[in-house]
Amino acid sequence: MRILLFFVITFFTFIQLSAQTTRNLNSENWTFQQKGDSKWLKAGVPGSVHTDLMLNNIIPNPYKDVNDAKVQWVENEDWTYKTSFDLTDAERKAQNIQLKFNGLDTYTKVFLNGKLILDANNMFRIWEVLVKDFLKYKNNLLEIQFKSSSNEGKQLANLLPYKLPEGERVFTRKAQYQYGWDWGPRLVTAGIYKPIELISWSNFKLNDLSYEILKLDKNKAKVKFKFIIQSKRNSTTEIEFNQKKYSQKLTKGINHFSIDEIIQNPKLWWPNGMGEQYLYDYQFKIKQGNEQVSKHLKFGLRTIELLQEKDKVGSSFYFKINGIPTYIKGANYIPQDNFVSRVSKNDYEKLINSSVEANMNMIRIWGGGIYDDDYFYELCDEKGLLVWQDFMYACAFYPGDQDFLNNVKQETIDQVNRLKNHTSIALWCGNNEIDEAWHNWGYQKQMGWSKQDSLSIWNDYQTTFHYIIPNVLDSILPKSENRYWPSSPSIGWGKKESLTQGDSHYWGVWWGMEPFEMYEKKVPRFASEYGFQGMPTLETVISMFSVKDTLSKNSATILAHQKHPKGWETINEYMQRDYIVPTDFVQYNYVSQLLQARGTQIAIEAHRRAKPYNMGSLYWQLNDVWPVTSWASLDKLGNWKALHYQVKRSFENVLISVEKEENVYKIYIVNDLLKDLKGKVKFSVIDFNGNKRWINDKDVTILSNTSTKIMELNDEVLKGISLTKAFLRIEFESNGEKYSRNYFFEKPKDLALTKPTIKIKKINHNQFEISTNVLAKDVYLLDENNQFDDNFFDLIPNESRIITGKNIIKNLKIYSLYDTMNAENQ
């Protein structure tokens, strides 16, 4: 028995020794040092210089107080990280050992046992180096030197005969938002922000495994699995998956081959709100002699098309998913932290779940951030969130020297190969707002460029976004997956064509100071950016302070956590138009959130009513990098602002919406479901005491995937009713499902609200019933560290609602708009 056990253990060990193995070096004891300093300090990998300086109490938390200004010196320094590691017996016996650097930020020299093995210059590239010849069995010293990205960028800028806008950031392939944006601080960091892996193998290595859907119908799917294997010799390898075995001859070097798989009665993958997100999970075993590599591939079966078809006003811009024209509902996503290594799996889950709960089906990954972590895309695959993937270029012009272009090409290859298997990828987009910047932002005059300068800069733009990136996509992706859009938007918001073709970033509201109602007149074919600022939740505001302080709009900390130069001025101007501006800070915070939600609601509903002319609405922005007053609907702590609750309502598959045009109220039902809806619509004009002043009803049929005007209500009907004291209630019931909408005839500041008596009846530890005697407008439920299934809602008399919190309700406070409209309450 002992002899048998010894044989089994020995045989198992032999198999393991011969396999391709990967070891993460994160857990090694890392230290770091500022150039010119003799001290070595403890470091966390993955991480960044800033997080490590905080770890060692060298700098304060830049998210607190006005500390971001106090840590600007960090970006001008050079830094070195080091660790040592031993080889395992298995690694020592392997014929090949490779170091893989998944994320180095940014200008880096890597030394292994004193030998320079890598000179890196791109945060977004994946660097692989064969290191077998440089390794020892024990005490291998890995040292990584980081140069100041700011200083390096400035030196590169000086090599050009002309200046490019945005200074040094455009010369460095790193996250552009680190240099500061109008929603985030300037924190130009450095460090090992993704894992370093030690990969060992002997006779073969699996370099890549991907798939292509060759055929897909209701009866059968044909999928091609594509392998790239690196072999040290001529040999035969066996591939096993789905209880099938295949044999493949390999030659010495790089081998490309494929295997077709038939899937009977395929289950389709659908975006959120359209059906199931079914994912096939294939486990592959690749064997050669005693060596084996395992790899799993998870994918959904679906088709995606981007259609741009000429019509009488311009050209459409819409996505077809599995042959169905799909209305896109979602938001623009920025990195979740200035120091991205701090973003946890829980953070990703919380954000993606909040997006799904808000009825979104797409996220646009904005081009000034990062190509995000694999886990982000995995969650999008699982939850049905389509991804509009920008390449990482934003709001500036980039150089076109050969070194830079080679860097761009390899970055594109690395990231497309990394992300290509994700079912959720719907579109690859070259950049954010650079085409618009060229044509509309007046840089040619501002920067004093000559005709030759301008020609050179435009040619560089064309080379990157109309040649290099699309050619890389062509070389890697099958035609069915190669959907490329060179720049978003295609036409600037000041041009009339921006409303008749392509995608649009409409900033007449906010930047142009146009009223919210302009959203109803300026409806594009696909709205890929628009938005308005609002303050974060009170919990997040308090997190800005290192010590408890009086909350005030004039606080240095509050002012420092608003990065738009005219942010407060703009918010105040719009607030005066629509609300009574509170003097109390808590109430101002509340109303700023209502204002943001109101403006965005007007935009979303105008877009959706215009279906199929408009087929997409992506607001700016989903989330924040730090605690800040911004366009986000989710603040830095992941709390839902009023906007996110409103988005959830405005993105429901069935939406009742009202548009006022002169003296007529046009009532629509938008149906994104893939089935017709039949039922009765009830219309009521109700005063704020709950009395019905006018009623009507109508039987309707709302066809699937349409926007339908069901009624026009003339001002004549409303004669004798004070519109400052009444609202229109619309209720629709179909197949047991109920939908409703309250529409107010006047702006919030003009409503003649009376003080509501709001009653709470506890049901259990996190659930209660809420009711009121008169209209309670925009009811705000505030409980520390809690989120409710609905908030910032209208509570009407003679009705009650059941509200559920995610956590135990501890100290519930309730506000309504009435509290902000009376001097004694402020």
Where are the regions that the model predicts?
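Substrate-binding clefts and catalytic carboxylate motifs of secreted carbohydrate-active enzymes
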Residues: 25, 34-35, 44, 177, ...
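Bacterial Sec-dependent N-terminal signal peptides
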Residues: 1-22
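Accessory beta-strand-rich segments of carbohydrate-active enzymes
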Residues: 25-28, 33-35, 76-205, 231-232, ...
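Intrinsically disordered, low-complexity Pro/Gly/Ser/Thr-rich segments with frequent PxxP/GP/PP motifs
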Residues: 248-267, 688-722, 786-809
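Active-site-adjacent substrate/metal-binding segments within catalytic domains
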Residues: 60-87, 94-100, 105-111, 118-121, ...
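Active-site neighborhood of glycoside hydrolase catalytic domains
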Residues: 400-493
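Extended acidic/polar, glycine-enriched regions
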Residues: 135-139, 226-310
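Terminal connector regions
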Residues: 291-295, 716-754, 808-826
